[in-house]
Amino acid sequence: MARSICFFAVAILALMLFAAYETEAGTCKAECPTWEGICINKAPCVKCCKAQPEKFTDGHCSKILRRCLCTKPCATEEATATLANEVKTMAEALVEEDMME
């Protein structure tokens, strides 16, 4: 009985983590740290972003504050796959333990 409760607790926690990783997928944004002044033209902003060590792939000027914002794909696909494999392994181990008892 205690193993079943533990199994369901781990499964629910894993699903919550999986859902959290899924909501973060998409595009990561950050303000360009070396940009000075008002951002009016996209081309210099893109150049500034690509020169950053964070390996940004694109950039654009924000509409209201006119700041240079750098963008890149978030690396959550790998994290999601890893998390899914870990959850599967944990679930299989718990089921195996329940069967042995």
From Swiss-Prot:
GO terms for cellular component: extracellular region; vacuole. Its main location: secreted. It is found in: Secreted; Vacuole. It comes from the Eukaryota. Stable under extremes of pH. Keywords: Antimicrobial, Disulfide bond, Fungicide, Knottin, Plant defense, Secreted, Signal, Vacuole. Gene3D superfamilies: Knottin, scorpion toxin-like (3.30.30.10). When compared to other plant defensins, the petunia defensins have an additional fifth disulfide bond. The keyword Nucleotide-binding does not apply. Belongs to the DEFL family. Plant defense peptide with antifungal activity against F.oxysporum and B.cinerea. This is Floral defensin-like protein 2. It comes from Petunia hybrida (Petunia).
